[in-house]
Structures are given as C-alpha cells and as structure tokens.
Amino acid sequence: MDGLFVILPLVIGWLLDLMLGDPAWLPHPVVGFGKLIAFGEHHLNKGHHRTLKGALMAIIYITGVFIIAWFLHNQLCIMHYALCIVFDTVVIFYCLAGTTLIREVRAVFLALDRSLEEGRKQVARIVGRDTSELSAQEVRTAALETLAENLSDGVIAPLFWLAIFGVPGMLAYKMVNTLDSMIGYKTERYKAFGCWAAHIDDVVNYIPARLTALLMVIAAGKTKLASFVWRNGRNHASPNSGYPEAALAGILNCRFGGPHYYFGQLFDKPYIGTNDRPLTTQDMRCAVRINRIAEVLMVVLTVLVMGIKEYIII
C-alpha cells in the first residue's frame, strides 16, 4: 500500500480525537469489548480452574479481535483503498482517548471548585479506587495520576502497537487494556480469573509505559529527570504505571502514590516523589500541556516508523 494511504488514517484519526474526543452519542467498540468480557466473566468465573478459564478467555478474545480486524482491513483494501482508509481512520479515532481523558480531568478540578462531594463523584468516573472518603488533595492527586497513567494506556501504547502491527494490533491492544481494567484486580473475585489478563497487560505495556515517561520529560524540557523517573517508577504496584506517574511527579515536583482503597480493601502502595505540597489548577494545566506535547511527539514517531516500514516492504 502507498505510504500516504498508511499514514493518512493515523493523521485524520488523531485529529478527529483531538477535536471530538469520544462523543457520547457514538457507539464505541470498547463498550462492546466490555459487554463481551462481562458475559465471559459471568459464565466462567466460577467453580474450578478459574485461572485457566480466565487465561483462555483473554487469549481467545485478544487473538479473535486481531484476526477479525486483520480480515476486515485486508478485505476492504482488496475492494478499494478508500474503504480501507475509512476503516483504519475510524478504528484509530476510536482507539485514541487523549482528549476525553483531558476533559474528564479538567471536569474533576472544576467540580472540586464547587464542592468536595462533586469532585469525588467526578473523579470516580476515571479511577478504580474508592473515592467516597478522599480529601480534596487526594482527589486532585488521583486525577493527575490517572492523566499520566492513561497517557500511556490511552494514547502512547495504542500508537505503539499501531506502528508495530497496524490497525489489528491497535484494536487487540484495546482488548488487552479493557480486560485488565475489568478483571485485572487482585481482589478475591478476580485474583485467579483475571491474573493472566493482568500479566498480558503488563507485558504489552512494558515498552510503551517507559516510552511515555521519556516523551513526557522531553516535552517538559527536563531530560535530567530521567534518573528520578527510573528510580521512582519502580515505586508502584504495577510494573508499568509508575513510570509515567513518576515523570509527572518529577515535572510538577509533587508526590503521588500511597495507600488506596479498592472495592473496600486497603492496598498500601509506595509513594512516588517526596514533596507533599498542595496540588493546584495550574498543575493540572501544566500536566495537560505535557500530555499534548508528548502526544504530538508520539504521532510524529509513529508516522516515521510506519513510513519506514512501508518503504522497507516496498
């Protein structure tokens, strides 16, 4: 396929996400993924061999999404390049979540300006932890941690797998990410059934999470923070999430992490950074700016990789 036809869907899809985010009135494939996962979990997460059943479900769902996307992409390309471009553009648009997350984080800070209770309710939309007892500082911290972590999950990682395996790889990654967000918890209900979903998510996010942190410190013009990120990025229950969070903590000179409640259970997480200063709206604006610059850098990098791949294949 001509290089322009490979790169055009990426640029258009990214610009659409930049302008529109995820409109509530549009059906989203991740919602379908979620229903499929909920169906499988309901029927399989019971009785014996839960770990095996959870692993098989995850593998079947991920490979199934990849194969279906690969088949559709190739069939549409055979029919007409224009159809292929439309399909790829729509998938890329749906798989990127940069704008929606930024809107949600801004909404958290605006809600906090009205009341603590509104802030708690708003942040509950984007975090998995229990929010009913969070202080205003903890609400702001949760929002900014999520902004950093989901720059990786919602933008950098999807683009990384797009660059490596094309649109099928990008969609398969979204299935991995959705599986982890729904069943990848260490609670009594999910610790056996969802452990392989969590392990797969750890593997596919290993490089993107560290790349995200690198892009963030470059975007901030603070490459000397690399040692801080490497040292503090390991202070997290996740092998990956700590790196983008450490990058933002270093950029803002603040502290993330600490103990949180999930589904009523206390998880004692280490701290990232040491400066426990109050977070402000200005910090949120700085974090959003860093996200956007890192996003642009990743789009450029993805275009270069896809262009080189196309040139080599030709």
Predicted regions and their residues:
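Substrate/ligand-engaging "lid" and interaction regions
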Residues: 177
